[in-house]
Design a protein with these regions (language model features):
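FIC/Doc superfamily catalytic core
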Residues: 1-119
C-alpha cells in the first residue's frame, strides 16, 4: 500500500529538484542543502515586508516555487500560501480559484515562470 509514496513527506527535500513542462526542464531548484536557509529567509521577508499584499503574495509565490523546498506538492503549497496571504488582506480572496486559473492557463504560467528565470 505504501509503494510509490514519497519518502520525504513532512520535511524538506534531500535531493535535486526541478520544474518540468512536458519533456522540458524549465527550472532547476537550488541545492537541497540551501533549502532550510532559503525558506527561513523567505518567511522572514514575508513577516517584515512593507510591500502591498498583492505584490507580497506574488513575490512569495515566485520565490517559493523557485526554492522548490519539497519533493512533491510545491505548486499546490505555493498557491495555498498565496491565497492565505491575499485572504488575510481581503477575505474575498479565500474564494479565488487560483488552482483552476493556473490549470486553465498552465502553458502560459510555465512560460512566464521560465521567462523570469532568464531575466
Amino acid at each position: 500500500m505504501e509503494a510509490g509514496l514519497i519518502d520525504e513527506i513532512g520535511c524538506f527535500r534531500k535531493g535535486g529538484a526541478g520544474v518540468v513542462s512536458g519533456k522540458t526542464v524549465i527550472h532547476y531548484a537550488p541545492d537541497a542543502e540551501r533549502v532550510p536557509f532559503l525558506v527561513n529567509d523567505l518567511f522572514e521577508w514575508l513577516r517584515t515586508t512593507d510591500e502591498h499584499p498583492l505584490i507580497a503574495s506574488c513575490v512569495f509565490h515566485y520565490e517559493f516555487e523557485f526554492i522548490h523546498p519539497f519533493a512533491d506538492g510545491n505548486g499546490r503549497t505555493g498557491r495555498l500560501w498565496q491565497t492565505l496571504i491575499l485572504s488575510r488582506w481581503r477575505p474575498i480572496f479565500k474564494n479565488l480559484p487560483i488552482e483552476n486559473i493556473v490549470y486553465k492557463y498552465q502553458k502560459e504560467y510555465y512560460k512566464a515562470v521560465s521567462y523570469t528565470h532568464l531575466r
